[in-house]
Structure formats: structure tokens, C-alpha cells
Amino acid sequence: MYRSLRPPTSIPPPPPSGPSPYPAMINGYPPDVPVGSPANGDAELFVPLQRVMPPTGGRNSIRYRNYAPCQNTTKFFYVDNKLSDLDTYNEDANHSNFRTTVIHNQDLDPSTAATETIQLDNRSCWGGELKTAVKTNCPNISSFFQSDTVRVRLMSKRDPGGTDPDAGVNNPPGAEYKWYDLRIPEGNYALNEIIDLLNEGIVQLYLQEGRQNNVLKSDIGVKFDTRYLDLLKDPVTGLVTPGTYVYKGYHPDIILLPGCAVDFTFSRLSLLLGIAKREPYSKGFTITYEDLQGGNVPALLDLSSVQVDDQDEDVIVVADARPLLKDSKGVSYNVITTGVTQPQTAYRSWLLAYHTLDSPARNKTLLTVPDMAGGIGAMYTSMPDTFTAPAGFKEDNTTNLCPVVAMNLFPSFNKVFYQGASAYVQRLENATQSATAAFNRFPENEILKQAPPMNVSSVCDNQPAVVQQGVLPLKNSLSGLQRVLITDDRRRPIPYVYKTIATVQPRVLSSSTLQ
């Protein structure tokens, strides 16, 4: 069943032995030469003597004081609030414009450390890997960033005597208009709070001058709102059939009367309101009444002029429909019936005009998401004593002319959130305020009443910005006292920076002597 194993009948011959094709050498000598004895012949290979002394310096050496050169990678640390620097150099400085010592030897006082230098071997071209970390506490409404002021054109004077609401025209006698600077308090607000403060500022301007010069409440010609005022507009009568505008916020809006305007030329408030220029680099940004063609706010239906006689209470006699001319307090809605096909108010809405094709508002402006950060741009870092000036700059230590070595977006962000039933929250808030008319001065007037908040709203938030800025050319001689400067788009130190740290890690980029 199994086969037995049999031994091989023949054994293969061994390989032929002969001289090796390669010479047998040990350290360049034949193997028969004793180690340490003089060779009978010259060695085939030259073996240099072993180096027993370490180098005293090199192209990557870093010298500091009288210590031995350091040839390992090191780091320089820049800190904005060192106690020794505060007492010595930064009494009148801030976190965006300060001087700091990069020599942290505890045996040296700040004055001595500032006179020391760190030498990078001048036979090499050095670069430093820069990493910055900045923390800010910037509000979205501030005078520094021009987000607390806007210019408005309002009626400042008119002839005494009211305007007949039944006249069907809007022509206040002897009306004079004037530009005002509307300023709101600095702070960090939500979008609906900014709109409330703007409207309250309009009322204050009216009480300050217009009221004393025969200007009526119905002549207040600038209103910031959030509603689509043409919702539920009847296509036949042109009237808003419920007799009231839909109280729901959608997007910030500007409502104007003839002769009134809003100027955003030197203000960032347009960005907070989501109203931007379609050509952002053009000069000036003014929204006038004439720009809002096609945006007339429809008049309200006077419910007392019609009689609902059907079961579902939806059918009315069109011939009997009349516009509502004034509110319960007698404040006119400035309804125009002369020269128009359908009754409409003299008020014009930017939001309605924007959605009218080929209107000046649509051609000049752009509806955007409200930027609660105020559209603040970039943040520039300058370290004139550490890095050589990049191409396009020249060496300068002046505050507004320092060469820029790093940049990043300002770490202030717009955060969008959804708040359901925001109008109910507003009503509850107004009910708990001691001054119930703080932001709702004219609750009976459908135009001038408080604007409803939006369910999709925004807030401003500051978050730390940690940025790896890359490798930049270093100077070969670094003084112990270094200047750090953080500026805005206009090259001004930013007062809202309250923590700044940076690290620089030097390394050799190339040789400055070998070509």
C-alpha cells in the first residue's frame, strides 16, 4: 500500500573551487596583514581618520549671548501680556500694538533682555514658520467700525395745518427736508433689536425738530421694517383685504415717503440689514424715494365700506370697496387715489421695489443674508523687527505703513438661527416691559407700528482665530525686543483684540554664500 523510501543512487558533485572574482580585503588591506602592522603595499581604499571633535558652528547655528551655538530647531514666543513687558514698554499700548521680549531668560531683567540679540548664522538664508492666535470681543454695533451711524433725510418743517386724507394726493404744503445723523447705542444685538433701535432713533429725530415745526406723525418718512406689505393683496381692487398687513417678518426693509432717503455711504448698517450694492466698488450708497419705483405699498381695505353677505364670508361687492384712509387715532395712511388705476399709499418699500423687474432698486441693490458681523473685513499682522519685508513692501516701522507678514479674516462671525413664534416672544416681551411703548410708539398705525421679528434671525459671535501663516524670510539679527502690530483694513490697531500670541520656528532655507 505504501512505497518504501529508497536512498539516492548517486550524489551530485560539489561546485568547482577556484579563485574568487572579488578581492578579499579588510579595511583596504589583504586579510593576511595583521591589524595595526604596516602594510607591505598601498591600500586600495583611503579611510580618513575618525572625527573626534564636534563642530564649533555651522550654517544652521543660532547664537545667543556667550552660550554655545544652538544647532537644533528652536522657537520664538510672542506674548502680549507679559508682566515685565507691561511695566516696562506697554504702559500705553494694547493687545494689537505692543512690544514684547523674546528672550525669556529669568536671570535678565526686561531692560537687559531688550538689549540682547539673537544671531542667526549669516551664511544661510533663514525662514520662520509663523503661527498666530488672536481672540477678539468685537460687538456688531460700534463707532470704530462705522456700524452705529446712518444718515437719513426726513421732513424737518412744513406749513401749519393738516392734510386732508380724502384729498387723494400726497403734497404737504411748504415741506422742507434735512439730512440727519441717526446714531444707535453701541452693543451686540440681534437683528430685530437693531431694527427697533433704528426706528426709535427716527422717532427721536422727529420729536427733536420736526414736531416743533408742524410735521405730523404721518409725515415721518423713514421706517425700517421686516414685512412683505403686499401679502393678501386683492388683484382686482388692489387693496389688502383683511384690513391689516400680515404681521410676520421675512427680510429687513426700508419704507420711504416722497423726499426722504437713507445714505449708507459711510455706514456698515446696510450689510447688517441685508441690503448691498450690486456694484460694490462704486462710490456712494444712497437709497432715495425715486429708486423705489414700483414698490408702492398697497392701501388697506376699509372693512366698514363693504358688507359680507355670503356664508363663507369671502365675497364682497367690488364697487363698494374703499381704501382705509387713516387709523383709529386719525393718523393718515397717505393714500393716493388721483392719477392711479388702483388706490395705493405714498409709502414705497425697498423690498417690494426690489421684486419689481427692471426697477432702479433691483438694478442698483442686491438682497443678501444679513451679516450681523457688520461686514468687517480682514485682519493684518505685522512683525517689522522679526521678518524682512515681503515683496511689494519696504522696511518701515510706522504704525500704518508696517509691512504685512500675515493676514486672515476678522474672527467675528454671523450665526443664523431659527426661532419659532418670534412674534409671540416679542409680544410677551413688550408686555413685561415697564415702558410698553418703548419700541411700539404707534400700535394703531399699520405702517408705523413695531416691525415683527423674523423666525430666521442672526446674531454676532467672536471665536478665536488660530492660523498657520506659512514660512517667511527672517532677519539674521533679531533684537530681544520685538514689535507686534495687528491692524484692520484701514491699517489701524484694533482695540477689540484682547489676546494675541504667536510663535516663530526658524529654519534654514538656503545658503547665502553658495550659488
UniProtKB/Swiss-Prot annotation:
GO CC list: host cell nucleus; T=25 icosahedral viral capsid
Residue span of region Disordered: 1-25
Q: Where in the cell is it found?
A: Virion; Host nucleus
Q: Name one Pfam family in it.
A: Adeno_Penton_B
- Identify the keywords attached in UniProt to this record, alphabetized: Capsid protein, Host nucleus, Host-virus interaction, Late protein, T=25 icosahedral capsid protein, Viral attachment to host cell, Viral penetration into host cytoplasm, Virion, Virus endocytosis by host, Virus entry into host cell
GO biological process entries: endocytosis involved in viral entry into host cell; virion attachment to host cell
InterPro entries this protein is in?
Adeno_Penton_B
**Annotated GO MF terms:** structural molecule activity
Which coarse location class describes where this protein primarily resides?
A: virion
Positions with biased composition (Pro residues): 9-22
UniProt keyword annotation of S-adenosyl-L-methionine present: no
Induction remark: Expressed in the late phase of the viral replicative cycle.
Which positions carry the signal peptide feature in this UniProt record? none
Matches recorded under Gene3D superfamilies: adenovirus 2 penton base, domain 2, Penton protein, domain 1
Superkingdom as given in the UniProt entry? Viruses
**Protein's job:** Major capsid protein that self-associates to form penton base pentamers, each in the shape of a pentagon, situated at the 12 vertices of the pseudo T=25 capsid. Involved in virus secondary attachment to host cell after initial attachment by the fiber protein, and in endocytosis of virions. As the virus enters the host cell, penton proteins are shed concomitant with virion acidification in the endosome.
What does the subunit comment say?
Answer: Interacts with the fiber protein (via N-terminal tail region). Interacts with the capsid vertex protein; this interaction binds the penton base to neighboring peripentonal hexons.
Q: Miscellaneous notes for this chain? A: All late proteins expressed from the major late promoter are produced by alternative splicing and alternative polyadenylation of the same gene giving rise to non-overlapping ORFs. A leader sequence is present in the N-terminus of all these mRNAs and is recognized by the viral shutoff protein to provide expression although conventional translation via ribosome scanning from the cap has been shut off in the host cell.
Q: Which family does it belong to?
A: Belongs to the adenoviridae penton family.
The protein, known as: Penton protein
Designated gene of the protein? L2
